[in-house]
Design a protein with these regions (language model features):
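Extended terminal accessory/targeting regions
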Residues: 1-148
């Protein structure tokens, strides 16, 4: 879980770079976004590993925030699964272009990493897309349903 200051910064960056799908962020409060956002990496990874990956790839954090919200709202269809992963790749390229100049090698590193992460999600994430969300909001809702 992230703090609201980090989420505010990521929200700002998503707006600044006009990332695809950024409208999904407006559905939630910053507190809820902080509960939904788990950093870069799947829920199955331990939090320390997601933290390390996120620290190594900070420019992809606003892309991952949108992606996490899409996965939070998963409709469990293959079309939306594919679109979410393709959007991650496109948004990563947008961020890379916006943050780094043409001659800066980091531009191409970030773009490549976004593409790779999107491919990992495509090839390894279908099961997670089809299972219930594990964010604190969804866990609380399931607990309330269970206990009436």
């Amino acid at each position: 879980m992230s703090d609201t200051n980090e989420i505010l910064e990521l929200y700002y960056l998503a707006q600044k770079y006009k990332l695809e799908g950024r409208e999904i962020l407006d559905k939630y409060s910053f507190e809820d976004l902080a509960k939904i956002f788990n950093g870069i990496g799947p829920d199955a990874f331990p939090s320390w590993l997601r933290c390390v990956i996120s620290k190594l790839h900070p420019s992809l954090a606003p892309v991952a925030l949108i992606h996490d919200c899409e996965w939070h709202e998963s409709d469990r269809t293959y079309d939306s699964f594919t679109e979410s992963n393709e959007r991650f790749k496109r948004n990563g390229a947008i961020v890379a272009k916006g943050m780094y100049s043409f001659f800066n090698p980091r531009r191409y590193i970030v773009k490549n990493q976004a593409y790779r992460f999107g491919c990992y999600c495509e090839h390894l994430g279908w099961h997670a897309w089809c299972t219930p969300c594990e964010c604190p909001i969804c866990k609380e809702a399931r607990a309330k349903e269970k206990h009436g």
